[in-house]
């Protein structure tokens, strides 16, 4: 994919950055279907709640504030950021404010649980070293009352039971149940009991429900790959029986590149490396931790996260099919696997909700308050920043490097590809000031301006190789435009700069992007300003922050009105409609009408596949090799749900048996319609590519 990545980046760098609320990724395809992920950016440890016709989703925010992000939806597909639980950590501890060499990267607030009871919303979560926290509000928008419940209860789920008791389920491996006090002042003493013993293959990330008198506990395990389990019992105290309800669904994405470093936030120059991903490995790239929810008409859905390369963990939506009393993920003909693209949930707002993204990512800083998309890296010093004259002003404070710079403003990087640009005014910098656009991660990177005495230097820095490139620069009006170009599906990115906001030049080399367990977050686009000489300095002003997403508009990716060949990604060979009536592969140079196809739109994301010789593809049986046939009768044509990868790669899922069309790269058998899905490397024969 290297040549493809280079071409993508060459095209992206030529884009112009004018401020506008450009189209941003939404899972809603606008035709009655959705495509995972729900958000093409980070939203980890999701917990889902329905109140009437409204759905609420809460997620981990770790060390960034405002903390505990809350999204709202009316159709489970289109989400809007409506609130956070708190503006800043209120603990008297320097680590929460990145002060005096202390930090809480990846150890802030995480794994929340959201509940609604007697007219009040409750959100529970853990803070490392501080214990269990509870936030209570009459309205989802807040204000939220904070109660420090303390106690070692984490990765929990809470159930308000019919008898008035409140239970917290928690623990890893050995699962425990503890009763909580009604006033949320803490756990009830001596009520903790083990309900699932170690050795039951149950992990963490619990979500407890009571459905038709039965207790269901949805959890995840990482031994060795992420997967989702369900435990059920007639009593909250057990005994529980356990069943795996989904495993190995990666949608064709392999494990992430991972950072290796001894220690945490180490000085620049400390050895850092990135382990390349094994394309055949799953690790935690499959859908795993999350919860389930019902619609008013009785449908059930799961919202689970997956480790999504350098973007971090993101959320997926999967249909739930009840089988023998178990909430299995997936469709009737393919239980345990989930479609990347499927019909939207049957909610009252399914057909009326306008597709939209959770956030407005671009910002010209003209407002009186920061947009909700922004989060500070640790608690900010509110005396050292402001929104002034339509610009974000960051005053510099002492720091040795980006990861220790206070008042760094961040937002989640967005995939699959994005171009982040900001205008920077440096006229009020002082000696030793450093400011610019960066990626808060381990390893981190940045591009910006350094002031030494009266000299301004354009600097590119990458922590992975401790590499610095300095470029002397003259800024007649003290302005420069900085840009980050990210290809997050391929974990590549680079910086660029412009002196006029129009013509951009690459700065530094292309970088490998990774995920890691130090910040426990994916890539974060960051606006920063600090002083490297150990003192307070001047200030930098940022304006016209834009995020462009070239692949957010997916309307042109299904090749309607085209005639094309279909190449099997695993074999590299074209699909061939044989005279015998089967689908097979053929020589690479075969360009006969029997190797050319067209797709016909049947509405709601469904298509049929027609060969250029007039025949239609269908399955004559259960989908085994040899069942995929050709017919002249359009009424027999198989309806497929097109599953697109936004790069001409796709899969075709039968609407009849919920399996995928594919061909083994090793056995020599003809095409079948019995594939459960793609493997992480997309080499099992189920992933196809179209070419004109």
Which stretches of residues belong to each language-model region?
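Alpha-helical interaction segments
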Residues: 9, 45-46, 69, 134, ...
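Short hydrophobic interaction/assembly module
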Residues: 14, 86-92, 614-617
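Lectin-like carbohydrate-binding module/patch detector with strong preference for beta-trefoil
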Residues: 555-692
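Hydrophobic h-region of N-terminal signal peptides that target proteins for export
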Residues: 11-19
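Bacterial N-terminal signal peptides that target proteins for export
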Residues: 1-7
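A residue-level detector for conformationally permissive "hinge/kink" positions
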Residues: 7-12, 230, 290, 382, ...
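Carbohydrate-active catalytic/glycan-binding domains of CAZyme proteins
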Residues: 20-557, 594-598, 637-641
């Amino acid at each position: 994919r290297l040549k493809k990545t280079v071409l993508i980046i060459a095209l992206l760098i030529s884009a112009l950055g004018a401020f506008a609320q450009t189209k941003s990724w939404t899972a809603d395809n606008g035709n009655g279907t959705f495509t995972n992920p729900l958000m093409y950016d980070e939203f980890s440890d999701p917990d889902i709640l329905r109140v009437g016709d409204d759905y609420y989703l809460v997620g981990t925010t770790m060390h960034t504030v405002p903390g505990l992000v809350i999204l709202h939806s009316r159709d489970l597909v289109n989400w809007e950021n409506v609130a956070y639980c708190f503006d800043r950590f209120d603990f008297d501890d320097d680590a929460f404010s990145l002060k005096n060499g202390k930090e809480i990267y990846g150890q802030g607030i995480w794994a929340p649980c959201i509940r609604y009871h007697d007219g009040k919303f409750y959100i529970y979560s853990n803070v490392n070293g501080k214990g269990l926290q509870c936030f209570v509000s009459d309205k989802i928008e807040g204000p939220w009352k904070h109660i420090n419940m303390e106690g070692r209860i984490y990765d929990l789920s809470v159930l308000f039971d019919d008898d008035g008791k409140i239970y917290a389920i928690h623990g890893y491996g050995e699962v425990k149940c503890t009763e909580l006090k009604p006033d949320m002042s803490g756990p009830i003493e001596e009520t903790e009991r083990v309900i699932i013993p170690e050795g039951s293959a149950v992990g963490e990330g619990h979500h407890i429900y009571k459905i038709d008198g039965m207790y269901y506990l949805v959890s995840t395990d990482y031994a060795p790959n992420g997967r989702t389990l369900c435990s059920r019992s007639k009593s909250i105290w057990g005994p529980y029986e356990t069943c795996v309800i989904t495993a190995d669904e990666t949608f064709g994405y392999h494990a992430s590149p991972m950072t290796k470093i001894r220690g945490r936030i180490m000085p620049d120059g400390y050895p850092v490396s990135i382990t390349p991903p094994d394309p055949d490995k799953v690790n935690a790239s499959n859908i795993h931790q999350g919860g389930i929810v019902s619609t008013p008409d009785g449908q059930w859905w799961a919202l689970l996260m997956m480790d999504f390369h350098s973007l971090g963990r993101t959320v997926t939506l999967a249909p739930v099919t009840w089988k023998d009393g178990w909430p299995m993920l997936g469709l009737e003909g393919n239980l345990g696997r989930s479609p990347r693209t499927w019909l939207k949930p049957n909610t009252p707002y399914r057909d009326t909700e306008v597709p939209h993204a959770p956030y407005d990512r671009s910002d010209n800083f003209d407002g009186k308050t920061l947009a909700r998309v922004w989060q500070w890296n640790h608690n900010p010093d509110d005396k050292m920043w402001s929104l002034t004259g339509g610009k974000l002003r960051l005053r510099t404070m002492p720091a040795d490097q980006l990861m220790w710079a206070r008042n760094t403003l961040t937002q989640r990087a967005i995939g699959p590809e994005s171009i982040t640009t900001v205008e920077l005014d440096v006229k009020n910098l002082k000696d030793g000031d450093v400011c610019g656009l960066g990626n808060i991660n381990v390893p981190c990177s940045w591009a910006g301006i350094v002031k030494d005495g009266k000299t301004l230097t354009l600097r590119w820095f990458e922590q992975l190789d401790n590499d610095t490139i300095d470029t002397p620069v003259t800024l007649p009006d003290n302005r420069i435009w900085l840009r980050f170009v990210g290809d997050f599906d391929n974990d590549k990115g680079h910086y660029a700069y412009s002196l006029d906001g129009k013509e951009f030049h690459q700065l530094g080399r292309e970088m490998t992007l990774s995920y890691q367990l130090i910040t426990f977050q994916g890539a974060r686009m960051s606006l920063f300003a600090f002083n490297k000489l150990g003192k307070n300095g001047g200030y930098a002003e940022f304006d016209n922050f834009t995020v462009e997403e070239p692949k957010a508009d997916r309307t042109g990716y299904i090749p309607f009105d085209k005639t094309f060949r279909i190449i099997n990604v695993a074999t590299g060979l074209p699909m061939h409609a044989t005279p015998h009536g089967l689908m097979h592969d053929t020589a690479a140079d075969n360009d006969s009408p029997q190797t050319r196809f067209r797709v016909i739109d049947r509405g709601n994301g469904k298509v049929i596949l027609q060969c250029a010789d007039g025949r239609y593809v269908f399955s004559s049986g259960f989908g085994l090799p040899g069942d995929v046939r050709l017919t002249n009768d359009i009424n027999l044509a198989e309806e497929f749900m097109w599953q697109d990868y936004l790069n001409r790669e796709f899969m075709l899922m039968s609407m009849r048996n919920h399996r995928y069309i594919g061909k083994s790269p090793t056995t020599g058998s003809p095409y079948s319609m019995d594939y459960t899905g793609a493997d992480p490397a997309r080499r099992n024969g189920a992933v196809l590519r179209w070419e004109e």
